[in-house]
């Protein structure tokens, strides 16, 4: 029998578990997969299968991440879980697993701990838009007042980092009980409550094709008699022949018109997100466009040089630097398709950054780049990746 085609009838959402070590992230991940697979089909996963997360590479950085899938009544979810704290930091900063929402797991017995705080801060910095809380190990707390206290603490912590703490869904339960097949309030019922919260609280993400048109420039050719062709992969949106576009970054922004879209040597009337295309530009000279710029819908994205970012610096073992760096360190910042030199300003309380650290920095680039909050970049020295980062806030 032929393999069934994957029918994506339900909208797709990416989520992941975050929170302090040993608060039950992996147990909860296993419990969700197990309970939901019995209700809506899919694969149950054992704790050990998730905990033995395979290595993968993102932007030259090795990260251990477990990917599982499950379905609810309304949606299909891809869920990431990481074994170690360092893996979370790397994952969130590189955007290896872009999350539409996160499930913050917090032990009711311990309350918020240092990594609870750190993961909420990271989620804020890297632009995770929604957090839902699973208050775990509630079977170990008999005192209702204590539970209330922990819930208040978590809400305060979320509000402190600009998440809507008062309106955040908090589900009380026990991942362990649910995984063991307990049908009670803290077991299976709690997992179903969590599934409902995921469905109702995290909005369906915009598909790439519905975004405003953006294509990073990879190469530029001039074709005699036809003009200038720019090639690249469309990141989001749709480009139609005859539409006005802007060329943004590196130099002053220019306006032009798309007079043709080519794919696999065929002429099309439009290109869309995910397509590798050549775009023919009217009246644009070859030397007006270069790798590192973007083509975009006019007015949709601006060039910037000054921003704050959250970065992870590779350890020596990962092929990174062997020595720390200090204020005013000047590496290259690799955005989309090109390197731009920039200088790094460290936070007041930070004298230096060691390989393996993550830190908030302020960057000034020597040339402007088409930039939005949430844009990922690599930090390089002579073509070698020494770090990864994400734009947290644009200054100018």
From Swiss-Prot:
Residue span of region G2: 60-64
Superkingdom of origin organism: Bacteria
Keywords for this protein: Cytoplasm, Elongation factor, GTP-binding, Hydrolase, Magnesium, Metal-binding, Nucleotide-binding, Protein biosynthesis
CDD domains: EF_Tu, EFTU_II, EFTU_III
Binding-site positions, GTP: 19-26, 81-85, 136-139
The keyword rRNA-binding appears for this protein: no
Region: G4, residue numbers: 136-139
Start and end residues of each stretch annotated as G1: 19-26
Record-linked InterPro entries: EF-Tu_GTP-bd, EF-Tu_GTPase, EFTu-like_2, EFTU_2, G_TR_CS, P-loop_NTPase, Small_GTP-bd, T_Tr_GTP-bd_dom
Residues reported to bind Mg(2+): 26
Region (G3): 81-84
Localisation: Cytoplasm
EC nos: 3.6.5.3
Catalytic activity: GTP + H2O = GDP + phosphate + H(+)
Residue span of region G5: 174-176
Residue span(s) of domain tr-type G: 10-206
Cellular component per GO, a single term: cytoplasm
GO molecular function, one term: GTPase activity
HAMAP family: EF_Tu_B
Function (record text): GTP hydrolase that promotes the GTP-dependent binding of aminoacyl-tRNA to the A-site of ribosomes during protein biosynthesis.
Family: Belongs to the TRAFAC class translation factor GTPase superfamily. Classic translation factor GTPase family. EF-Tu/EF-1A subfamily.
Subunit structure: Monomer.
Stored PANTHER family: ELONGATION FACTOR TU, MITOCHONDRIAL, ELONGATION FACTOR TU-RELATED
Protein name, entry field: Elongation factor Tu
